Amino acid sequence: MLRVSDDWERALHAPASAVARPGGDVIVIRSGSSYDGKQGMSLATGVSSRSAGARALCLHVVTIPPGSRGVPHVHEGHESAIYTVSGETEVWHGEGLMQRTVVRAGDFMYVPPGIPHLPVNRSDVMTVAVVARTDPQEQESVVTLSLPPHLAELDDFPVASP
């Protein structure tokens, strides 16, 4: 059974810094700072072209507060892999966001390039997930979409990070 301590929250809000190792072969990003992504969620600064000089990927932690949601979006030309550390998220996905999948702590999810998706946290627990994407610029490929009419009830859910 995976156990998660509350240390992740403290680390998420500490100042981020990159630490170069002697010899220059690896870079450690001390997590801490975060930013509001176009997709409407708070992302902890992680590995990217900006923080580590990454050329083909980014890796960060996303949080979705209880009773909130992201913004419908796609990542044009980039794959995403997501591991849910804690919480439970309803993900609407596919053309017109017509498909619904529930992702729980311990689940992995793969999102192919260009697939629309929208995370919703209907629970009373913070969702924390680790996200890897083949976009080293992090936000470069994010294209936001409108909420489709069949999901209009989600207008009542605040966007996690407006």
Where are these regions (language model features)?
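Conserved metal-binding segment of the jelly-roll/cupin
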Residues: 64-67, 103-123, 132-134
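A short, N-terminal "cap"/entry segment at the start of jelly-roll beta-barrel domains
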Residues: 1-56, 71, 144-162
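A short hydrophobic beta-strand segment most commonly corresponding to one strand
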Residues: 59-62, 81, 110, 124-143
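Structural motif
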Residues: 88-90, 116, 126
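A short beta-strand-loop-beta hairpin characteristic of the jelly-roll/cupin
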Residues: 69, 78-105
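Conserved short histidine dyad/triad with adjacent acidic residue
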Residues: 45, 60-76
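Residue-level recognition of conserved beta-strand positions in structured domain cores
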Residues: 61, 74, 93-95, 121, ...
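Short strand-connecting beta-turns/loops that link adjacent beta-strands
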Residues: 52, 77, 96, 124-125
